[in-house]
A protein has these predicted regions:
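Conserved alpha/beta enzyme-core scaffolds, especially Rossmann-like or related mixed alpha/beta domains
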Residues: 1-15
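Conserved nucleotide- and phosphate/pyrophosphate-binding catalytic cores
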Residues: 16-190
């Protein structure tokens, strides 16, 4: 923060402790304390857990432990993933039936889909109840918790919505393949 001469640091909640340390140290270094903005962390689509304790707040600690990480390829979504890659990652995602809390697919619906679209469309065969639209996360959570929505239907619906959400980025990379290659060089996995 100080080396880059930043007035404001933006990051995930996992950087909160170091940012608070920077705010405490700034006056001692004769610098203004930076403004720090922290975003919630998207959970990994796979069951992963980092070792250690990261925050005194148990909810923040849990979100850091289960965060999406570029080092776990199948658990992380990349902005340059193809629609097929996104669909496959969601298809393989941890998504326990009737479990709302601690379910990464439900978390993605809550954090990605509803803020942008204010609804989640589920396309399914009439054999399985036909198409359905959930107009709020609360409505989705209630239905999923009761078992009215199958995990595969949830995965397919969230996958379609996330694919639509990043379509402008997909279009950009399709028109600028050299930038797509540069982005892929930055992707480091285990």
């Amino acid at each position: 923060i100080f080396q880059m001469n930043l007035d404001c640091a933006c990051s995930g909640m996992d950087q909160r402790k170091v940012h608070m340390l920077a705010r405490e140290a700034a006056p001692k270094l004769g610098l203004p304390p930076p403004v720090c903005l922290h975003n919630p962390l998207l959970p990994s689509l796979q069951i992963t857990e980092a070792n250690g304790s990261f925050d005194d707040n148990t909810n923040i600690n849990a979100s850091i432990k289960h965060k999406m990480s570029k080092s776990v390829g199948k658990g992380a979504l990349w902005i340059n993933d193809t629609s097929q890659e996104i669909r496959e990652k969601y298809r393989q995602a941890y998504c326990p039936q009737k479990v709302v809390t601690g379910n990464p697919v439900m978390d993605h619906a809550h954090m990605l889909v509803f803020p942008h679209y204010h609804q989640l469309d589920i396309q399914r065969s009439s054999k399985y109840g036909g198409n359905i639209t959930y107009h709020s996360f609360e409505e989705l959570a209630k239905a999923y918790g009761k078992g009215d929505l199958h995990p595969l239907d949830l995965k397919n619906g969230v996958s379609a919505a996330v694919t639509k959400l990043i379509q402008p980025v997909s279009d950009y990379f399709e028109n600028k393949p050299e930038n797509l290659q540069a982005m892929r060089r930055l992707q480091v996995t285990r």
